[in-house]
Regions:
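Basic, mixed-charge low-complexity alpha-helical segments
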Residues: 4-9, 49, 53
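A short, charged, amphipathic alpha-helix used as a generic interaction element across diverse proteins
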Residues: 40-55
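A short beta-strand micro-motif
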Residues: 6-10, 23-28
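Metal-ion/cofactor- or nucleotide/acyl-coenzyme-handling active-site neighborhoods
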Residues: 4-5, 30-35, 56-289
Length: 289
């Protein structure tokens, strides 16, 4: 695993590519310029690509033996109310989010309601510029909009998390669902981790391109951009599963898709395909009737 300094530099390069001047990691926030030289900032995409290669090489050099994935129970066995975490990976592209209505609490992120016209119960945005953009479109007036307690966020309608964890939107939304909302049964859609191939396959090794529903749209990178380093998201979700062993995380994936092994080893992280997910939704409808 890459050292903390390397992870800060990598996160800073990612922030620079997004046009941000600050970076958050390990519960702290700092200036991007503190971690990158002026030369590196002139071409942040090139800098990011170099850092990703370094981190990948370091990770492989220290790779422990792969542990087998334990058997999982994929049947519908909810505890309490259900929460749907809607991330923005392309694996959910052909799923109609309206099927979730009336089945449980929906927690989306970033531009979901504006671009897809699907309004979840709650929305998570951790990037200050995105929060401002959504506020200008009056999104916080129509749903519960969460973010970190950062000074750049002035809209009083935004619900502030008590402490800035420095996490990405998906893992942060999951943690709020667990620790603020107290859900113990979570379904996670579109949290793909890996990049995507030109054929649209989510793959850890061959998926070299950006995997995001909104690539090419306002506030997002170009459609042909390289994939984003997922190590930080992965570690954050591992923390969620570890800190909440009594919660079940149903990770909804395509038939040819799987979770990173580090998560798959967790007994409460359960991959299910969309056919099995549809079965679960039908069971929810039966319980509600």
């Amino acid at each position: 695993m890459a050292g903390r300094r390397a992870q800060w530099r990598l996160a800073s390069a990612q922030a620079a590519v997004r046009g941000e001047t600050t970076v958050s990691l390990f519960g702290k926030t700092g200036e991007v310029s503190a971690w990158l030289t002026p030369e590196q900032l002139t071409d942040p995409k090139k800098t990011l690509a170099e850092f990703e290669k370094t981190v990948k090489f370091s990770s492989r050099a220290n790779l422990p033996p792969v542990e087998p994935v334990p058997p999982k129970d994929t049947e519908y066995k909810p505890e309490g109310e259900v929460c749907f975490i809607i991330a923005n990976g392309e694996s959910r592209r052909n799923f109609d989010l309206n099927k979730l209505k009336g089945k449980g609490y929906t927690f989306g992120m970033n531009v979901l309601p504006v671009v897809e016209n699907f309004w979840p119960d709650a929305l998570m945005s951790v990037d200050i510029a995105t929060v401002k953009w959504l506020s200008e479109k009056d999104v916080p007036a129509k749903l519960e909009h969460w973010s970190y307690p950062r000074g750049g966020v002035k809209d009083p309608r935004i619900k502030r998390i008590a402490k800035d964890w420095g996490w990405s939107s998906g893992p942060t939304a999951t943690r709020v669902a667990l620790e603020y909302k107290k859900f113990k049964t979570l379904y996670i859609l579109g949290m793909d981790f890996f990049g995507i191939t030109p054929e649209g396959i989510v793959d850890e090794k061959k998926g070299s391109k950006l995997n995001n529903m909104y690539k090419g749209k306002e506030r997002y990178r170009k459609a042909n951009s390289d994939r984003t380093y997922f190590g930080n998201w992965l570690n954050q979700m591992v923390t969620n599963t570890t800190n909440h062993p009594n919660a079940n995380f149903y990770h909804v994936v395509l038939d040819n898709q799987s979770s990173p092994n580090k998560l798959a080893q967790k007994t409460n992280w359960i991959d299910i395909n969309y056919s099995k997910f549809e079965e679960h939704l039908q069971e929810m409808a039966k319980r509600a009737s």
